[in-house]
Design a protein with these regions (language model features):
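Solvent-exposed soluble domains appended to multi-pass membrane proteins
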Residues: 1-267
Length: 267
């Protein structure tokens, strides 16, 4: 893995500095997706992978959520847990138990199979949230639901072959925050980290990222790694957004954060 030994500021480190226990629960092996290296680098004290539960196969969402609930119920509060599911990572496989969604009038089986996969995830996620409510954890938690990448673009729904950045929406949902907003403008994944720092009361943490908190800054555009962009290109933030990928790459390849302290400013 390249740059796995680098120093990285992260939400996990920021919350550990505030006394949180931090744990990462993944459905695959620790060696997959470099979780064994990235978990401690991003501030996670404990990593649970499928072998932690005696499994040889990748954990389904239902099993992963059940095992995660068991762990969370016995973890000392406050804690920060990341739970990494996989069912919608490549959701093109035909479902073993199709629902009425499979009768959707389209020639694209990829579209139907993807809808089925997200339907299954929604059901399992809903069941997990109900379980958190039943054991009393839900009311004491801020819950972030975030996608790391898109899968089937909206262009498929429209019958368009070419996929643009506008077709590549990903989920970002926050539950139980002090704020109530529905963000209608364009924003990017680069804005997730500073938004989570903000909602968790970590605004004095030494590194706030290259994006902006959506609760404080009117973000109206996003820029992809290939230079394509979406939204208001006249935004005063746009120029910095176009530079962020190059800045990030230089920071990673040069181990920019090595030897730096990321304590809270008031300290």
């Amino acid at each position: 893995m390249l740059y796995g030994e680098n120093t990285y500021p992260a939400l996990g480190h920021a919350l550990r500095d505030k006394g949180y226990r931090t744990l990462n629960i993944v459905c695959d092996r620790a060696q997959d997706w470099n979780q064994a290296e990235t978990s401690p680098a991003y501030g996670f004290e404990t990593l649970y992978d499928k072998t932690s539960f005696g499994a040889s196969e990748t954990l389904s969402d239902s099993v992963l959520f059940a095992e995660s609930l068991s762990i969370l119920k016995r973890t000392q509060e406050p804690f920060f847990s990341q739970i990494v599911t996989i069912s919608t990572h490549a959701p093109n496989k035909a479902p073993s138990n199709p629902t009425a969604l499979s009768r959707y009038p389209t020639e694209s089986r990829d579209l139907v199979n993807t809808m089925e996969a997200f339907h299954r995830l929604d059901r399992q996620l809903g069941s997990f949230l109900d379980s958190l409510k039943a054991c009393g954890l839900y009311e004491r938690s801020v819950i972030a639901i975030v996608s790391d990448h898109d899968e089937l673009g909206k262009n498929v729904l429209d019958g368009r072959e070419h996929r643009t950045l506008a077709d590549r929406e990903v989920a970002f949902v926050l539950l139980n925050t002090p704020y109530t907003i529905s963000y209608e403008e364009t924003a990017g994944q680069i804005d997730v980290y500073p938004t989570l720092l903000d909602v968790m009361g970590c605004n004095e943490y030494g590194w706030k990222g290259l994006g902006y908190s959506l609760f404080r800054t009117p973000v109206e555009s996003a820029v992809y790694w290939d230079g394509s962009s979406l939204g208001n290109r006249r935004s005063p933030l746009y120029s910095r957004q176009t530079q962020a990928w190059d800045i990030s790459r230089l920071m990673i390849t040069g181990d920019f954060f090595s030897g730096k302290s990321f304590g809270y400013d008031e300290e």
